Amino acid sequence: MSGIIDASSALRKRKHLKRGITFTVMIVGQSGSGRSTFINTLCGQQVVDTSTTILLPTDTSTEIDLQLREETVELEDDEGVKIQLNIIDTPGFGDSLDNSPSFEIISDYIRHQYDEILLEESRVRRNPRFKDGRVHCCLYLINPTGHGLKEIDVEFIRQLGSLVNIIPVISKSDSLTRDELKLNKKLIMEDIDRWNLPIYNFPFDEDEISDEDYETNMYLRTLLPFAIIGSNEVYEMGGDVGTIRGRKYPWGILDVEDSSISDFVILRNALLISHLHDLKNYTHEILYERYRTEALSGESVAAESIRPNLTKLNGSSSSSTTTRRNTNPFKQSNNINNDVLNPASDMHGQSTGENNETYMTREEQIRLEEERLKAFEERVQQELLLKRQELLQREKELREIEARLEKEAKIKQEE
């Protein structure tokens, strides 16, 4: 089926001008998930150093700050199509006992890029050099546990899926056998379906899509989550094989681009060739338009804005002791005995509690929206002030130039 991807990629290339393309992808995963190695493998060169922040069993630290690191790489394929790939790495994600700040940092970054577009669209004269920083795709790396999603995985996709195209990826899939990998994929997709998590599943319009694209998208859906293998090493194999990027084992060298054992090549082609424009269009026409409509109408920008304050998420185990009410899919209720002993009072208390929780949730939603709109208004005012200062400075420079020219003209006349 990989031939379908190649044919579809060639067809889509002919539909677009051969000019520079800018594409932004965010790589999210816990330390040890292979983010840095995957970035280097994706770009075919050393872009970032491998992470050294893997926590040891004896490490007693509970808080590690998330960092957003941006790298820009220019790629060019065999047909001369240039892609400016903006990569956002997320070292420190999921390495704390309380990971809610990490969610907020990533969410705020994505929202800020939308706000910048919204601000640019509101200007009378737009900046021709304005750079669109919107994140077109988020690759979420899942550790190969052989099980389904952990709580942190569920919460991240639940909270960020309405803002960015999330594609789930099983990293370091060579650590699993074929049967284990097949089971791992099945369990992950069952969790995604069970909790109705919003991921990018290569959507399409049945009335407009061609038969070839339909077959391609359906094939890509069967591969979710993609299973990848990365490597920072390049080996010279000799003969017709030439140079490969692979991983060395006692029994030989594994080619990470071998589609029979890894989905890496298919994922790379989907990201950078066949579905690059689809991801960009979906970001602009669906995700951004939804954000824009809700922001201007004063409604909730995303589904998570109506949730109570985030509680602590365990970044290392799905058996977390988190006490979030009605939002933890992995925690069973422990109030069964109380319900049996005193059902009437419990129902009354539950009703009152739910009403209070709904009221507080609504108040929190309104407060968050007011803060966001206030910050947006302040940013607009600041932009206007800076533009006004630039205009005044420009007028001053023009007056000085005019005065100098007049002075030079008078000197020439006197001579």
Curated annotation (Swiss-Prot):
Q: What is the effect of changing G29A?
A: Abolishes GTP-binding; no strong effect in vivo
The annotated region (G4 motif) lies at 171-174
Q: Where is this region: G1 motif?
A: 29-36
Domain Septin-type G residue range list? 19-298
Glycyl lysine isopeptide (Lys-Gly) (interchain with G-Cter in SUMO) crosslink residues: K412
Q: Mutating G230E has which effect?
A: Temperature-sensitive; no effect at 23 degrees Celsius but loss of function at 37 degrees Celsius
State the name under which the record lists this protein: Cell division control protein 11
